[in-house]
C-alpha cells in the first residue's frame, strides 16, 4: 500500500488501515488501471476512489446519479478540509463559467456531476482542458439495460473513453449480476479492467420468510419479541399510517 495513502487515510478519515477489500481497489487505481469494483452498501466504496485522488495530481471527476448523494459526499469531504464541488440544478451560464474556471485551475480536488451534464458542450469543453486524474462512475449498474436501476442518461458515459482515451476509468457498484458486470465493462469500453469483488454478505442483517394467515397478528408478535430497530414495508401510505397507530 502506498504510504501516502495511509497518511491521508489517518489525517482526513482517522483510520489506521484500510479494510481488506479496499486495498486492492486503491492499489489498482494508484497504478492507473481501469477498475471495476463491487462492494456492499456501507463497504466504503467512496473511500476507495477518494483516497487515491488525494495521492494523485489533478481533479477527480465523479459521475453520480443522485443529487442527494453528490451533495452528501461534497459535504463530508468539505468537513474533512477537502475541496469538492457538485454541479447540480439549473446553473446560469455565467455562474457555471465561474465554477468551471475554478475547476480548470484545480481549485477543487473532486468534481461531481450527473451524467446529463456530459451533454453540455460548455461543461465538456472545460473538462477536456482540465487536468483530470481519473474518472469515477458511481452506481455503475445504472448503465446496464439488464439492471433494475437502468438510467438512459448513464449511456452518455459510453463516450468517456472516446473523449478521454488516456484517463483511467473506475466503475463502482454495490450490486451487479454477471450479465450487468459484462455490460458495464463493454459499455464503458474497459474490457481489460481489473475486476475486484468484495463479499456482499451483510453479517449484521438477517432475512427470514414466513407463510402466515394473519400478517398483522404475526407482525405484532415479531415486533414485540424483537427489541432492536426494525423496518416494515407496506404497499401504500394509508397502510403505514394504520400500522403506526
Regions found by a protein language model. Name each.
Residues 3-12, 16, 20, 24-36, ...:
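Helicase motor core with emphasis on the C-terminal RecA-like subdomain
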Amino acid at each position: 500500500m502506498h504510504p501516502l495513502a495511509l497518511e491521508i487515510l489517518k489525517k482526513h478519515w482517522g483510520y489506521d488501515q484500510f479494510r481488506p477489500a479496499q486495498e486492492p481497489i486503491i492499489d489498482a487505481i494508484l497504478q492507473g488501471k481501469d477498475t471495476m469494483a463491487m462492494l456492499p452498501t456501507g463497504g466504503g466504496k467512496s473511500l476507495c476512489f477518494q483516497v487515491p485522488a488525494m495521492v494523485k495530481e489533478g481533479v477527480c471527476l465523479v459521475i453520480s446519479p443522485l443529487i442527494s448523494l453528490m451533495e452528501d459526499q461534497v459535504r463530508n469531504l468539505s468537513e474533512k478540509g477537502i475541496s469538492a464541488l457538485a454541479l447540480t440544478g439549473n446553473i446560469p451560464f455565467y455562474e457555471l463559467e465561474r465554477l468551471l474556471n475554478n475547476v480548470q485551475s484545480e481549485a477543487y480536488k473532486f468534481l461531481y456531476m450527473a451524467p446529463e451534464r456530459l451533454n453540455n458542450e460548455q461543461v465538456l469543453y472545460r473538462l477536456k482542458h482540465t487536468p483530470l486524474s481519473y474518472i469515477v462512475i458511481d452506481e455503475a449498474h445504472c448503465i446496464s439495460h439488464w439492471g433494475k436501476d437502468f438510467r438512459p442518461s448513464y449511456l452518455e458515459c459510453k463516450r468517456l473513453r472516446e473523449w478521454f482515451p488516456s484517463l483511467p476509468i473506475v466503475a463502482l457498484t454495490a450490486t451487479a449480476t454477471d450479465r450487468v458486470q459484462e455490460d458495464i465493462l463493454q459499455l464503458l469500453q474497459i474490457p481489460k479492467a481489473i475486476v475486484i469483488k468484495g463479499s456482499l454478505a451483510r453479517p449484521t442483517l438477517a432475512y427470514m420468510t414466513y407463510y402466515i394467515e394473519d400478517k398483522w397478528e404475526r407482525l405484532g408478535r415479531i415486533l414485540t419479541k424483537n427489541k432492536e430497530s426494525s423496518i416494515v414495508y407496506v404497499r401504500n401510505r394509508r397502510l403505514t399510517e394504520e400500522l403506526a397507530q
